[in-house]
Regions:
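Membrane-interacting alpha-helical segments
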Residues: 1-7, 61-64, 97-100, 156-167
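Alpha-helical membrane-targeting segments
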Residues: 4, 67-93, 97, 165-191, ...
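Acidic/histidine-rich alpha-helical segments that form the ligand environment
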Residues: 6-29, 74-130, 137-140, 194-197
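A short structural micro-motif
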Residues: 16, 46-50, 141-145
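Alpha-helix boundary/capping and short turn/kink residues
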Residues: 33, 63, 129-132
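Conserved alpha-helical segments that form or flank metal/cofactor-binding pockets of metalloenzymes
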Residues: 35-83, 153-156
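Preference for long, well-ordered alpha-helical segments
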Residues: 102-193
Length: 197
């Protein structure tokens, strides 16, 4: 395994989690659905904890949390852009549309976040023994939460759009009702939505 590339992944993970905190803070301001707002408030607290967990990885393996990398700068730019998109929607769109923009921005942020943790899972299988325990412990604390953030919010985005289009929506979405934690579970929940109308 290439150590420079592993470090790059870790720097991007930290930046993604830090940006995720700002994404959730802004998304909560956009939320008009009380259930969604509560969900995102929970995810904000979890994401703040994820920042701490990744910081502990850095401390454990001797990385500087303040170091810059080209990839980290790009991740920060993407996160800032998602926040800016939500701020534009808040200032200029109807509340229901701003809420949809927020859900889409959360899905975009969580897609990168989910990938980071999935890659760390792959790294863990090949990691040196002194890193393996650190990575496994972090993965165990975060994995289910990351799955929930992505799959549940994707369900919210879909159902909010359906409602916005004037069609019957399932609120909360099936992904949340069925508490899905896998892509297969999310696909099954999506298929079952018509039965929940």
């Amino acid at each position: 395994m290439k150590s420079d590339q592993l470090n790059e992944l870790l720097y991007q993970m930290l930046e993604t989690e830090m940006g995720g905190v700002e994404v959730y803070r802004t998304a909560i301001r956009c939320a008009t659905n009380d259930g969604l707002k509560r969900e995102w408030q929970k995810y904000l607290q979890q994401t703040e904890n994820h920042v701490q967990i990744v910081t502990e990885i850095f401390e454990s393996i001797g990385l500087d949390t303040g170091a810059e990398t080209p990839g980290r700068k790009v991740v920060r730019h993407v996160g800032d852009s998602l926040v800016k998109a939500m701020e534009i929607a808040l200032a200029s769109a109807p509340p229901e549309a701003a809420q949809i923009v927020a859900a889409e921005c959360v899905v975009l942020a969580e897609t990168k976040d989910h990938l980071n943790w999935e890659l760390l899972g792959q790294v863990t299988k090949k990691a040196k023994s002194e890193y393996r325990k650190t990575f496994e412990a972090a993965q165990e604390k975060v994995e289910d939460e990351e799955d929930e953030h992505l799959y549940h919010t994707a369900g919210w985005a879909r159902e909010l759009w359906i409602e916005f289009l004037g069609m019957p929506a399932v609120m909360p979405p099936p992904e949340e009702e069925k508490d899905v934690k896998t892509a297969i579970g999310a696909a099954r929940a999506k298929q079952a939505r018509t039965e929940m109308l």
